[in-house]
UniProtKB/Swiss-Prot annotation:
Residues 516-797 are annotated as: Required for binding to PKP2 mRNA. It comes from Homo sapiens (Human). Belongs to the beta-catenin family. Phosphorylated at Ser-285 when localized to the cytoplasm, PKP3 at desmosome cell junctions is not phosphorylated. Phosphorylation at Try-195 by SRC is induced by reactive oxygen species and potentially acts as a release mechanism from desmosome cell-cell junctions. Pfam families: Arm (PF00514). Poorly differentiated, high Gleason grade prostate adenocarcinomas show an increase in phosphorylation at Tyr-195, potentially indicating a role for SRC-driven phosphorylation of PKP3 in the dedifferentiation of prostate tumor cells. Residues 56-82 are annotated as: Disordered. It is a peripheral membrane protein. It is found in: Nucleus; Cell junction, Desmosome; Cytoplasm; Cell membrane. This is Plakophilin-3. The record marks S285 as: Interacts with SFN. The keyword Nucleus applies.
Length: 797
């Protein structure tokens, strides 16, 4: 068999929390199994207790015709209020009777009184699918000083409306207050056969599985909730206060201030019941007692602050969008906050309101409030802008034209987490517009890296122990912003590669997440996607000096050198000279591996190990593993010498083939594109193709369709699989033998004959080339005929 007969070029390049810990059903069942005798004794004991209690009440002095117990009577009789303990032995649902018998088998417990500062069954959103628990409520610990075992008494506090984050949802509905971050829909982009690029905007489904702490306060609005989100399993929420969205918090503060003045003195023994449901934003309207319309904005300046807040608390039904925009120009910060809060609420998901707000010049007025002296005004102005620009290209452009990027970066320097979350959320929304990406990259990358990425990743300074919930959300927003920018033009990718500290921060954050066991986090997904995009066409776009360093003097140069230029007594065909490129690879490898910085990380041998760890440890987030495989595909693509070096590093040192094949068995079509593309590149550069054939061929044949009824992967995946098989067949008889043994010929002939679409035409041509190469193995012709195949099946049209 002659090597020249092979068509070598045919396929080559391309949880709520409750203060009453109730017994479980299992315990109640066990207590009920005590028998009739125990029931009779218990009933007699209770009757004796009631008789003794009535006798004691008849002996006490009466006040206004009522018997009043002495203050310490309960304690002296041993009937002090008890505390429930979770799943404690001997607990019974019958333990709420009063007993004078201290030796009784149970502890009498009186009905506990609620305190608004204590936990209630409505104190956390029901997010059972993600095991998310609110961790604090009005300053109280989620589990108290004694942990979850008992409810600690808390001093009475004034009531306040329960925010929407503290209400129990219906069923297991998730908190849907995340709309203004849903601007990044990554749709399919153009790919060539060798490279892998994450396209530009995140799909809504891709942004619905945020970490729990990212959901604490993702959105700027507070008036809408919905269910059905895809929450991740087993998320952890660091201890923090329950967060309410700005508009709800502001409007409820106005109402609480009014209600607290209407409450009389404290009544001994009174029980303050928590509000079961927070009033809606619409119920907190602005109205005046003596008029049916809103007065001029400047008229409010003559009111004292106390009187203003009293009037503001009456409701929100009479305010409209034009009035809210006018409030933005008021001198009273309370009115500015109210105006921004209304705009934020109104523009949550109302496209008409966003258009009306732009026509009323709300955008420039909000921009002027980004750096207001009052931080509450800043928070609500940025929150309103975040909703205003969501899914509205005109409002995004208006923000940029009003010098909004400069003002946002000034605001980003404020050490207030709420502000920084809003600013990074606005930047993320802006980055979904293709025509703004280049300008955003030019104006924001350096400051965003210095102010957010480097400090929160621990790169270039003292290592970061752990991000709190707010810092994690800020970092997540920032990496989402970079993810969108990285899918823009070549110039934007190059600017991101050259931005000092950006790549270092991303690599450091991924390493920290792997060490902490948090590789499923969405910020890790964003970071890996950015690295994948920055690796796209890397060898064509990298600095020439770096490329020359990586290329060195390769095998091609040595093989093509004239005999007179060969130093020493070795001819170009000698074994010694053939070993020189391997020595050059090792020398360049050791040199490049030393302390990579900046864009050097993109082609460093250390990055291969990082991607391999992600492929092996990340089990739930398929987007992360897809991005890691895509990044490896990019840096092993093409005919460059360094692509071959990294391919052999992945195969021989990182042992990446088995993790890849494990992924191929269960991967969806999106993952298969990256995985098969990577295996295709590895098969071209593998030194031992016989060993690779033994591991790969049978797994890939399983993915090929063999009949019309069988489910087939996309044409791009089929082409990648056939290309891998072709790379192995032309160099390894074992691959050809395994194709016959594992019924690969039948599937290849089926693919070859199926030409019912342009995509199937591509896979058909690939199958034809592979079959033609298989026929070159003369020793297998007898086996082919024994299986019922003829020459026309291999070489025919």
């Amino acid at each position: 068999m002659q090597d020249g007969n092979f068509l070598l070029s045919a396929l080559q390049p391309e949880a709520g929390v409750c203060s009453l810990a109730l017994p479980s059903d299992l315990q109640l069942d066990r207590r009920g199994a005590e028998g009739p005798e125990a029931e009779r004794l218990r009933a007699a004991r209770v009757q004796e207790q009631v008789r003794a209690r009535l006798l004691q009440l008849g002996q006490q002095p009466r006040h206004n015709g009522a018997a009043e117990p002495e203050p310490e009577a309960e304690t002296a009789r041993g009937t002090s209020r008890g505390q429930y303990h979770t799943l404690q032995a001997g607990f019974s649902s019958r333990s709420q009777g009063l007993s004078g018998d201290k030796t009784s088998g149970f502890r009498p417990i009186a009905k506990p009184a609620y305190s608004p500062a204590s936990w209630s069954s409505r104190s956390a959103v029901d997010l059972s699918c993600s095991r998310r628990l609110s961790s604090a409520h009005n300053g109280g610990s989620a589990f108290g000083a004694a942990g979850y075992g008992g409810a600690q008494p808390t001093p009475p506090m004034p009531t306040r409306p329960v925010s929407f984050h503290e209400r129990g949802g219906v069923g297991s509905r998730a908190d849907y207050d995340t709309l203004s971050l849903r601007s990044l829909r990554l749709g399919p982009g153009g790919l060539d056969d060798r490279y892998s690029l994450v396209s530009e905007q995140l799909e809504p489904a891709a942004t619905s599985t945020y970490r729990a702490f990212a959901y604490e306060r993702q959105a700027s609005s507070s008036s809408s909730r919905a269910g059905g989100l895809d929450w991740p399993e087993a998320t952890e929420v660091s201890p923090s206060r329950t967060i309410r969205a700005p508009a709800v918090r502001t409007l409820q503060r106005f109402q609480s201030s009014h209600r607290s003045r209407g409450v009389g003195g404290a009544v001994p023994g009174a029980v303050l019941e928590p509000v079961a449901r927070a009033p809606s934003v619409r119920s907190l309207s602005l109205s005046l007692a003596d008029s049916g319309h809103l007065p001029d904005v400047h008229g409010f300046n003559s009111y004292g602050s106390h009187r203003t807040l009293q009037r503001l608390s009456s409701g929100f039904d009479d305010i409209d969008l034009p009035s809210a925009v006018k409030y933005l120009m008021a001198s009273d910060p309370n009115l500015q906050v109210l105006g921004a809060a209304y705009i934020q609420h109104k523009c949550y998901s109302d496209a008409a309101a966003k258009k009306q707000a732009r026509s009323l010049q709300a955008v420039p007025r909000l921009v002027k409030l980004f750096n207001h002296a009052n931080q509450e005004v800043q928070r609500h102005a940025t929150g309103a802008m975040r909703n205003l620009i969501y899914d509205n290209a005109d409002n995004k452009l208006a923000l940029v034209e009003e010098n909004g990027i400069f003002e946002l970066l000034r605001t980003l320097r404020e050490q207030d987490d709420e502000l920084r979350k809003n600013v990074t959320g606005i930047l993320w929304n802006l980055s979904s517009s293709d025509h703004l990406k280049d300008r955003l990259a030019r104006d924001t990358l350096e400051q965003l890296t210095d102010l957010v990425l480097s400090p929160l990743s621990g790169a270039g300074g003292p290592p970061l122990i752990q991000q709190n919930a707010s810092e994690a959300e800020i970092f997540y927003n920032a990496t989402g912003f970079l993810r969108n920018l990285s899918s823009a033009s070549q110039a934007t990718r190059q600017k991101m590669r050259e931005c000092h500290g950006l790549v270092d921060a991303l690599v450091t954050s991924i390493n920290h997440a792997l060490d902490a066991g948090k590789c499923e986090d969405k910020s890790v997904e964003n970071a890996v996607c950015v690295l994948r995009n920055l690796s796209y066409r890397l060898y064509d776009e990298m600095p020439p000096s770096a490329l020359q360093r990586l290329e060195g003097r390769g095998r091609r140069d040595l093989a093509g050198a004239p005999p007179g230029e060969v130093v020493g007594c070795f001819t170009p065909q000698s074994r010694r000279l053939r070993e020189l490129p391997l020595a050059a690879d090792a020398l360049t490898f050791a040199e490049v591996s030393k302390d990579p910085k900046g864009l050097e990380w993109l082609w460093s041998p250390q990055i291969v190990g990082l991607y391999n760890r992600l492929l092996q440890r990340c089990e739930l987030n398929r987007h992360t593993t897809e991005a890691a495989a895509g990044a490896l595909q990019n840096i092993t693509a093409g005919d460059r010498r360094w692509a071959g070096v990294l391919s052999r590093l992945a195969l021989e040192q990182e042992r990446i083939l088995n993790p890849l094949l494990d992924r191929v068995r269960t991967a969806d079509h999106h993952q298969l594109r990256s995985l098969t593309g990577l295996i295709r590149n590895l098969s071209r550069n593998a030194r031992n193709k016989d060993e690779m054939s033994t591991k790969v061929v049978s797994h890939l044949i399983e993915k090929l369709p063999g009949s019309v009824g069988e489910k087939s992967p996309p044409a791009e995946v089929l082409v990648n699989i056939i290309a891998v098989l072709n790379n192995l067949v032309v160099a390894s008889p074992i691959a050809a033998r395994d194709l016959l043994y594992f019924d690969g010929l039948r599937k290849l002939i089926f693919i070859k004959k199926k030409r019912d679409s342009p995509d199937s035409e591509k896979s058909s041509r690939a199958a034809s080339s592979l079959l033609a190469n298989l026929w070159q193995y003369n020793k297998l012709h007898r086996d082919f005929r024994a299986k019922g195949y003829r020459k026309e099946d291999f070489l025919g049209p």
